Amino acid sequence: TGDPKGVVYSHRGAYLNAIGNIMTWAMPHYPVYLWTLPMFHCNGWCFPWTITALAGTHVCLRRVEAGAIFRAIEDHGVTHMCGAPIVMGMLVNAPDDVKPSLQKPVAMMTAGAAPPAAVIGAIEKMGFDIIHVYGLTEVYGPAVVCEWAPEWNDLPEEERARFKARQGVEYAMQEGLSVMDPETMKDVPADGE
């Protein structure tokens, strides 16, 4: 994105985003969180504070590889993790000999790009529960989410996955959100276009 740039975070902003993560994901006390995000990128989407606030366990990897991820899930009882769609694809396309049958669902938050509906469908069949968010470095990571509507539960799998690839409902802790025309700086219609 051009020359290196920096963003200064405030403690208050990081705190608000951490609370937003908890609320958005409806996270319970004592989660077991697997780190596949770099903590230096948007402060790990503020999950160092999110997990710690819930008295959770942080599970760290030396390398983000499918085998290591699946072993950590089994060995530590991972309940939550985050990862870009490329991590989802890595898990879906892992050799069968490293893919365990998950004993319980693993909640996975994804961002960085819109995940392909086929990847969402495939990874959910493996036992992952996907939530899609969008954010920017300037807003501490996640800022908007695909807020799931219960009526989507009965849709065909492909259509459900297509809906899950969307996002756009602001985090509760965000002051506001608007999408503007860059030339006029006026709000664009909220019509999904």
What is the predicted function of each stretch?
Residues 65, 86-88, 115:
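Alpha-helix capping/helix-boundary segments
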Residues 176, 191-193:
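AMP-binding/adenylate-forming core of the ANL superfamily
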Residues 15-32, 40-79, 94:
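Conserved AMP-binding/adenylation subdomain of ANL enzymes
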Residues 168, 188-191:
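Active-site glycine/GP-rich loop and adjacent strand/helix microenvironment
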